[in-house]
């Protein structure tokens, strides 16, 4: 299918950066859609990118009725579009016009996809009307930690592993090494640099006691894996990132690190925990389901059918 061109909505603007007024307008639309739908229309990264400076690589598509941003693809990975339409202006063709423009921009450099967070009926219908198909699924899993929830298995650390929490920037190089080895295939998680670590360490939710590091007892300087937890509010925690060095696979480190984080989140008083996992990552799904997680929601990336 050729890249879409043109639009019947001439007020749509494409730019490398947004002015202060447009940043505020985009954030209001995101907040309004989240309140209306019970789920944010944009990911954490896409929300942060709303006020990204020119030169960041992010492209913005904005109109009076909607907003989208385009994150460029890395290597063979597609560009990713995230979009929102003002809830009060839906079903008037604005979503289609916004995505037509966004795909037209994104596909100049290759393949592109658009996230539908929650895969709501309106998003499904819009995707179908544009000839888009499901190309990727990201599952949100949840389990309880509070009263009435299944008890967590005991945390048992093998003598071959040294488990501790984050000790500061001296740990960053090993975290980056393991992260980029574990997620070299991942469009968002792979290819991190020091700025990605600094951004998260500087976030309001960051807690060094919630970042678990597993080192090799025989080589204490070598990181085997890590688990970064996140606390969203007083009730909900998150298994944010679990990364294991591919060279250390098969030692049960994913389960160990996940369990360490779950015990920590339970100790902070969180009553529920969530995580995100690729829909086709059967090994990770099996691990999480054995730890009591169940499916809660789904995000779908829609794109052109393969071969178009």
UniProtKB/Swiss-Prot annotation:
Annotated EC: 2.3.1.189
Pfam families assigned to the protein according to its UniProt record, in alphabetical order: Acetyltransf_1
Binding-site residues, acetyl-CoA 1: 83-85
One of the GO biological process terms: mycothiol biosynthetic process
Binding locations of acetyl-CoA 2: 242-244, 249-255, 281-286
SUPFAM superfamilies xrefs: Acyl-CoA N-acyltransferases (Nat)
Sequence positions that bind 1D-myo-inositol 2-(L-cysteinylamino)-2-deoxy-alpha-D-glucopyranoside: 44, 188, 230, 238, 276
InterPro entries referenced in this protein's UniProt entry, alphabetically: Acyl_CoA_acyltransferase (IPR016181), GNAT_dom (IPR000182), MshD_Acetyltransferase (IPR050276), Mycothiol_AcTrfase (IPR017813)
Gene Ontology molecular function: mycothiol synthase activity; protein-N-terminal-alanine acetyltransferase activity
HAMAP family listed in its UniProt record: MshD
Protein's name in the database: Mycothiol acetyltransferase
Organism whose genome encodes this protein: Gordonia bronchialis (strain ATCC 25592 / DSM 43247 / BCRC 13721 / JCM 3198 / KCTC 3076 / NBRC 16047 / NCTC 10667) (Rhodococcus bronchialis)
Taxonomic lineage: Bacteria, Bacillati, Actinomycetota, Actinomycetes, Mycobacteriales
């Amino acid at each position: 299918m050729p890249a879409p061109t043109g639009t019947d909505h001439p007020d749509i603007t494409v730019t490398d950066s947004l002015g202060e007024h447009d940043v505020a307008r985009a954030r209001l639309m995101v907040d309004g859609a989240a309140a209306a739908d019970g789920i944010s229309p944009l990911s954490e990264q896409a929300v942060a990118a709303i006020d990204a400076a020119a030169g960041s690589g992010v492209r913005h598509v904005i109109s009076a009725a909607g907003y989208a941003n385009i994150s460029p693809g890395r290597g063979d990975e597609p560009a990713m579009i995230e979009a929102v339409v003002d809830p009060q202006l839906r079903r008037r063709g604005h979503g289609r016009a916004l995505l037509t423009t966004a795909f037209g921009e994104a596909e100049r450099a290759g393949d592109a996809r658009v996230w539908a967070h929650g895969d709501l009926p309106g998003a499904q219908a819009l995707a179908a009307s544009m000839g888009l198909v499901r190309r990727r699924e990201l599952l949100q899993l949840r389990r309880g930690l509070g009263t009435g929830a299944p008890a967590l298995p005991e945390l048992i650390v093998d003598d071959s592993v040294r488990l501790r929490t984050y000790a500061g920037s001296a740990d960053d190089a090993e975290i980056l090494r393991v992260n980029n080895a574990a997620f070299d295939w991942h469009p968002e998680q792979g290819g991190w640099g020091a700025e990605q670590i600094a951004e998260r360490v500087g976030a309001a939710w960051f807690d060094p006691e919630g970042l678990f590091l597993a080192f090799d007892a025989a080589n204490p300087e070598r990181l085997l894996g890590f688990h970064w937890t996140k606390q969203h509010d007083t009730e909900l925690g998150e298994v944010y990132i679990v990364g294991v060095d591919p060279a250390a696979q098969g030692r049960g480190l994913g389960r160990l690190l996940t369990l360490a984080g779950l015990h920590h989140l339970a100790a902070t008083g969180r009553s529920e925990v969530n995580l995100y996992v690729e829909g086709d990552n059967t090994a990770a799904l099996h691990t999480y389901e054995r730890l009591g997680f169940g499916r809660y929601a789904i995000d779908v990336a829609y794109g052109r059918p393969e071969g178009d």
